[in-house]
Amino acid sequence: MNKNERIILNSHLAEQNKLVGFIENICDQHNIYNSYYANIVTSVSEAFDNAVIHGNNNDDEKNIIVDFVIQNDGFSFCITDQGNGFDFSSVADPTDINNPIEETGRGIFLMDILSDKLEFKNNGRTACMKFLIANINKEAADKRVNKLKAYMHSDIKQTSLN
């Protein structure tokens, strides 16, 4: 069982299938299934999409590196693009009803609530999502569900106001 694995993908959304296969193989090796698997696939896929579209500006001459690293308390997936990076703190909170309805920020929000820790490095060129497998429990699951419900509820309110 390898502790670290890497895949380098072309900066094209069609590479999503290779990414999901990479994640599936890792999850199979480590017996990770059910809802936690869905959290991993959704958040890592969203980070990949952001890297293709926003980081590399759909330039298929560029690559995206996906690293899998095992730590003592879980593991991380880190997605690195070849773009200029971005300031994570400038992304609007999509759950704040005072923010105008925008398409941006929702993916980062999903990456954040579906992982146990989201961190941006490399001036925003690398997004790392940590999953604390040792800490899978009802409390953590309830916290995620409540955040998602609050987001969905605020989105429904905003939609009904228009």
Task: Place the predicted regions along the sequence by residue.
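Conserved beta-strand-loop-beta-strand hairpin that lines the nucleotide-binding pocket
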Residues: 1-6, 52-162
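Conserved catalytic/ATP-binding subdomain
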Residues: 14, 35-38, 62
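Long, highly charged amphipathic alpha-helices
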Residues: 18-22, 113
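Hydrophobic residues in the alpha-helical elements that line and stabilize the ATP-binding pocket
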Residues: 47, 51
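Conserved short strand/loop->alpha-helix "switch" segment adjacent to the catalytic nucleotide/phosphoryl-transfer site
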Residues: 21-45, 100-101
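STAS-typified acidic loop motif
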Residues: 6-17
